[in-house]
Amino acid sequence: AHESTLGNLFSDAYKWAVEQATGQTVDVALTAAGVIRETMPVGHVTVSDVFNAASLGVGTEGELIGVYITGADLMNALEVDSSVYPLMHSAQLFMSGVEYSYNTNRMIFNKVDYAMLRRADDSLEAIDKDKLYLVVTGMYAGQMLGSVEETSFGLLTITPRDAQGNPIAVEDLEDYVVYDEAGNPVKEWYAITSYLQQMDGTMEEQYGQVDSRKVIYESWNPAKLLRNANKFTYILLAVMLLLILLSALILRWIVKRIGRRKNAEQIKKEK
């Protein structure tokens, strides 16, 4: 897993385009590795380059959707990126509006040890697990995240919701496509193209390197292994403690049994 300049560009473009089209502030925008089909050339970028790099803009493919998720589910989305990615590379996520880090040595589904919302002015804001956040993504990534509960055997849930917090079925996500003022659906490739046009040639300056919105590292430091631990780490610790106690009890029983046998043999010799 890694932070990607192209992934950052795509997610930033989604956020910008939807805010322009709707006037709403988007909390987080995201895209998945499975959406990025090709790289884009250095220097002059054409609409065709963007169209080929992003999903096809046909039918419901490539349309941006806007849904709400809780802060707890946003954290679960980060765990999808850190824990599911090694098993399914297309699940790697790239986000705008959030910065986070994860330790690859931590417990699965608890690899993320730091996460904050990164606002437009670069200020940081804690993620409220009970609050609803407006999230923008493409249809492909939205459907993938909506089926996380099934693919993770119920261990992780990411429930798309409407503005009132009512759950949205995955098959109903098409009802939450983002439209501009003219009534046209906002496509991923169009969002990226429009974003690049308004940058006025500064893409290389802004996206020539990553900006540490996703930091991946490896450490066996106990403090870092337990930082912001969740239920999965606590369950693992409880199981490990139980195994240690059981091992100690079994060892104690074996020692006592050996001791009794030796005592019995000693008594027999004395007789």
Whereabouts are the PLM-identified features?
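Catalytic centers of hydrolytic enzymes
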Residues: A1-K271
